[in-house]
Structures are given as C-alpha cells and as structure tokens.
Amino acid sequence: AASDVYKRQDKMQWFNEPEQWEIKDKSLSMQVTPQSDYWRISHYGFTVDDAPFYYATYGGEFEVKVKITGDYKQRFDQAGLMLRINHENYIKAGIEFVDGKYNLSAVVTHKTSDWSVITLDKAIPYVWIKAVRRLDAVEIFYSFDDKEYTLMRNAWLQDNIPVQVGFMAACPDGKGFNVTFEHFKVKHLPDQRRLEWLKKNAE
C-alpha cells in the first residue's frame, strides 16, 4: 500500500526551510522564499541551491506523486517534485511560470543543469506530477485529473543509491508566492533486477 507520509511528518525534513509553512488535512502549504532556486552553471553562468525542499529519503525503486496548486506570479515561479542525490545530482519537475504562460517543466542536473518545457495553452488550476524510479532512470509524468498520465521526461539517475524524495518550490525573480502540495504518496516498487533474478531462480 502507498504510504501517506503526512501522517508521519517527522519522517520528512526541510532543506532550506521557508519562513512560513503549515501542514493541515494532509496538505502542505508554504510561502515560497523570494529569490531562491535550484540551478547549476549552464547557460546562465551561476549556481544556486537555496529553494525550499521538503523530503524523505528512500533507497531502491519507487513511484511518487503529488498534486500541486500554485499562485504563480513572477517569471520562473515554479513548484514540483524533486528527487535529489546531492547538490550536483537532482531532478525537479512540475509547473514553471514563464512569460505569462504555464509550462510543464523539468530540470535534470548532473554537475550542470538542463531544462525542458512543454508550454500549456491556458492556465490550469492544479497539476499532478508522478515520477517512477526504476533501474538507472526516472520517468516523469503529468496529469490534470490523476487518471490519465502523460510522459514528459525520461532521465538518467544513478541507481543503487539513496535519494531524497519530496517537493520543492522556487521563486528566482519574485517576492514569493503561495503553493500547496496535496496527496503526496511514495509507493515502494520491488527491485527490477531482483525480480528478474527470481524468475530465473524460482523455487
């Protein structure tokens, strides 16, 4: 069964805790720290690692999802899931507000960051983001109804190493904004390679 991490708030912790946040009815709301972001080096020439990230640590393979509702205001305001090994290796994926438009956005960082976007035609009230870690990759999906999920990115992430899993929000240019994360779930998946071994070595 999927674990509802909110029932065990002590299992999650902050990296760059924001000044204002609260957990209520299994949802977490925060006022995002102004002028904060996650990015390394490429294109812009700077490295920042100072935005709020609320996480628990998992080894092995898993599926994680969360519903995100944000009051995006300024260019680059963003909120999403984050999978982080360390300051040089992480993935963040969610919504990013750029040039007045909502973008399904993914940043994959291994020493340097990249950025991919899918621009949406209209503003949306919320989005679901799901990530599946299997072997040495993470598949990232989005949904507007938590029923039909569409792949938005498949990215490499080192296998067999613990990863911090949770949600982040950043406000690189603005004065902060409100965001709410709901229905956060992490589901353990049996190790793929072990399942294959079991098939060949069944009793």
Where are these regions (language model features)?
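Low-complexity, Ser/Thr/Pro/Gly-rich disordered linker/stalk regions
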Residues: 7-60, 189-203
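Tryptophan-centered short beta-strand motifs
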Residues: 11-14, 148-152
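Secretory/extracellular carbohydrate-interaction modules
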Residues: 37-102
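Glycine-aromatic-enriched beta-strand/loop faces of beta-sandwich-type recognition domains
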Residues: 80-132, 137-139, 185
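Conserved Ser/Thr-centered positions that define the repeating blades of beta-propeller domains
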Residues: 140-145
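Flexible glycan-contacting loops in extracellular carbohydrate-active proteins
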Residues: 155-177
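Exposed low-complexity, polar/acidic, P/S/T/G-rich flexible segments that act as propeptides
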Residues: 178-189
